[in-house]
Amino acid sequence: AFDVVEFELEEALCEPFRLNLKLASDKNAIDFRQVLDQPGTFTLWQDGRPARYVHGIVSHFTQGSSGFRRTRYELLLEPQLARLELCCNWRIFQEKSVPEILQALLKEHRVLDYEQRIYHEHLPREYCVQAGDSDHYLHDRLAFEEGLVYYFRFDEHRHTLVCSDRLYVQERIAGGPVLFSAQPEGDNPQPVLHSFRYSENVRTARQTQRDYSFKRPTYDQEHHLAGEALEHQGSSYERYDYPGRYKRSGAGRPFTESRLRGHRRDAREASVSGDDPRLIPGHAFALEGHPRADFNAWWRPVRVVHRGTQYAGQEEESADAPLGVSYDLRAELVPEDVEWRPAPLPRPRIDGPQIATVVGPAGEEIHCDEWGRVKV
């Protein structure tokens, strides 16, 4: 175990979290093999009780200077999902839906604490190609195309990756509402939010997509979708995308919907700061105490940065430290009823023709499907 001197936790919807820790130990020769690429848990305490757990895998470990009694260390904790960035591949997934592809991808990397919450039909993709992009980029690209969001749930011994196609029905934080107080920082007897800035931004109002399939060449598979909450902006700002990159009309509407939601992800947002550690991306909360009544509503964090220091426990080595113990957070929120989605990621491009191997059944040279296409 280490003594935590400083920490910074960055977490967001649809992103791997990063927990940077500055540590101290009375041991000056820790074996790196016992730490690097090993699981670890950070516990944030409040009023003598654990307020948050953050479990992850150590990605970076540094030994720093040694003082009179203690040696300083630095450590980076990330989820197992971040390890997918270390691998890339060239392959084709056939006749699998995106939830099935993601599940197979995570199983391949032994990400076993994984929970899918699927409420809508996701059609299988005839061909889905990974063209040299990293496994993590493929995971995010497919998830964002399909309108899936993910976040992490923690306990003392594990972190669970939760993936869903509906955000509105996800968790709410425990322990009652989050309080707002305009009093100066440090003057409140309980955790509060002490600043709240609400913004609205003009964004794309409509999304139109079209694509064709040789199976029905005269059908344009066109889909239109208008955004929500357009009362305060013009409704004529339209984005037209072609090709829509779907071969079935049943997939066209959710593709159009997820892209529009990604373009409008910050149309209504709030930036807050405070010291209530219960704020977690994806987990909704009720706000109370704001002087403007309509801000006292349900909100959902999409990004949170927690920072804390604990110099007092370093005894004589903390003599020149600027602070004793401190904690604060900054967060970005959206209204709870907003089906927030990340911006879509571009597909990788292949540079010119590729050499492929023609395959076929045993005893035959090639395999043709019902339209005469040769399988490679």
Regions found by a protein language model. Give the residues of each.
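Amphipathic alpha-helical and helix-coil boundary elements used as assembly
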Residues: 1-376
